[in-house]
Amino acid sequence: METNQHNATVPNHLVQWLDEHPPVLTDEPREAVTDKTAKSELDFYRLSMRRFDPREHGLPWSMQAQCPKCSEIVPAEFQMIKDQVVLVFDCPKDGRIKQAHYDNIFRPDPQNLKTYGGKAIEPILPMLPRTVETLCPECSAVILGRYYVRDGSVWVEKTCPDHGYFRDCINRDVEHYSKMAWISYGEHCGVMKPHVKDAKRCPSDCGLCDQHQSPSILANIDLTNRCNLNCPVCFANANVAGYVYEPTFEQLVEMLQRLRDYRPIPCTCVQFSGGEPTIHPDFFKIVSKARDMGFSQIQIATNGIKMADEEFARQAYEAGLHTLYLQFDGVNDDVYMKTRGKPLMKYKIATIENCRKFGMKVCLVPTIIRGENDDQVAKILEFAVDNIDTVSGISYQPVSFTGRIDMHELDAKRYTVGDLAHDLAKASGADPIRDFFPLNYTVPFSEIISVICGMPKIQTPCHPDCANGTYFWVSPDKKLYPFPMVFDLEPMFGELHRLAKKLETQGRKATFFDKLKIGWLFYKHFRPDRAPKDLTFYRLVRSLQGMVNKKVGRGSNAKTYKTLLAAGMHFQDRYNFDVQRIKRCVIHYSTPEGIFPFCTYNCGPSYRPFIEKMYAKKLNPKAENIPADVQNSKPAQVMETTTNG
């Protein structure tokens, strides 16, 4: 390992590659805003987030909390008692109750691991109850809260000094939560040249700052906030914002280059979003430029209206588009009238058919609201299986709440990744505990590919609360076989991780004999008696190669096998916000003002409106390219929510 001045390390097998591929842009990092340097509206907003800073404030910290005996909301106070963080409840009914909490906010972990920017990396605490740095849903100030277990569910509660008490459900299955929380393959050290140095606190200094700990596995770039729909669940709509945000081609190229300049792991996957990205006047030119700049995966977050046109889809494919992240809330128009206010199913079907014609992949993206369309989870899975030749995955997105909502309604409509695991298990025959895993579970797979190739490969060291799901093998008779049923994944990934670290330490690429050992590990942990009868080990290996190598292809011939990803990506909002999650975010936004984690840009502190206004244009009040049957529909009446697409 080569150690930099801040104790973060670059694996030796990547040193040569990094020397041969210096960044193109030479951006100088900006300083974190202070009382003396604050000038803009955004600057003062950043400062306001720090005004109750728990680390600066210290203990004791007064709040309200749910009594562990009677469940009433009572006065409480976090105190330091004999080097232990303790929440002291003052319950009128049950008296004074003390409850110790796991903590690394006031009791820093002694590990000496730092980011490339020199900031200490605090380990994830899987134990409960624990302290958490979170946000006030009303004002976005960073405040102290706690994760705790009640009636088999995991909850977060907090009290803002200005706006009072809030509580939200994190996961309705504590066993599912605990399994995810304990899975870890070590920490990543972030990016080598962060755009903000000497950050004071997360998330007040986003852009990315030197506290950030993860690379980007997928970067979003908003081409426009204009749209040919007016969905009530969208956070990026010019008709609501009152202005147009639409970067120029030159600005977009610079934003793309900033992603390619990520080190030590360049960003290779970009998603153009909006608004509706397909209505940008330079859409095809932008997609083509991304291909020429070396992005190996180019996708769009789209409602499918433009892509339903065959000629438009053909031009998009020829420009270099690989995948559609297709807004897909259900399998009939009754659902779309609820969530989008428009009958859209025919556009979804036409879009998928065009992707089938031109060989593009589709990932279905449903926004799931408990009690509204969670009955569609199984139906969407069935639809994906019926279209497995084109649909490669489903990214279920539990809704994020950006508007005000009382706790009763929040609980009624909050859909968690634990809910999703159980709904998918019922629909597929999978086990909600054994067969589902967090996104960071795949880190060893990326590590071993990197040492084989001798070059950086994207990794997913995100927080286990951010996303979880499973891959399925899909047999010709459309039966689903979860990967963990066919593979003993836990011991196999553990061995792959140890082998990758050994090769990194030795500073060399994998030899022929190393590759044989890797193949043996896959063979050793393969369970053919649990697999589809026609899934041979050779087809299995070729299928895994096809998931990371376009030359092999995904289920494209008799040598490979169809696979389907079914996962939940639970973006945060101010009610369930956890600063530890943000520091490990792997879904980023590239903007003219720098790069932001998804949940700080959209649905936590929400930097989006500040950035967009800085580059806004005069609003053309009428959305463009709206088909007549859609344009005349009335918008749905739902609460203010957010979704990606």
Model-derived features: where do they sit?
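Radical SAM enzyme [4Fe-4S]-AdoMet core and its adjacent flexible, acidic
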Residues: 6, 12-33, 357-559, 642
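Short, intrinsically disordered terminal segments enriched in charged and Pro/Gly residues
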Residues: 6-58, 104-127, 177-202, 206
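Short Cys/His-rich Zn2+-coordinating modules
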Residues: 43-55, 69-77, 116-123, 139-145, ...
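Short cysteine-rich clusters marking metal-coordination/redox-active sites
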Residues: 67-70, 91, 136-139, 160, ...
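Conserved alpha-helical substructure of the radical SAM core
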Residues: 90-98, 102, 148, 152-177, ...
